Amino acid sequence: MPATKERTYNETEIAERLKELPGWYFEDGWIRRVYKTDGWPTTLMLVNAVGYLAEAAYHHPDLTVTWGRIIVKLQNHAAGGITDKDFELARKIEEVALWRPQGGALEGTPNKWVRPGDPK
């Protein structure tokens, strides 16, 4: 039985879906997110977290890594565009990258850590 090609989204549909993912944007065929960090150690921890999620999902983003920033780019190469896999992995990355303990025994770090904000 031949494999079914995954549904890809057009730019209008992508823009609508990205409303659910503040900070993510569509550019040059990729959905993207810039995460700013408080420096190299935090950047590396975030890269490792993204790598773990990508490997567990078996869907791998392109990453750009600098001292205080990581850029995540997602698209489904096999499908030739943006698919549900991209949105699902983006949502999980966002959840993990911006998670902070609230209302429990965990105190959380006093550092700024990963900063949401300007996507570019």
Predicted regions and their residues:
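Long, contiguous binding/interaction regions
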Residues: 1-120
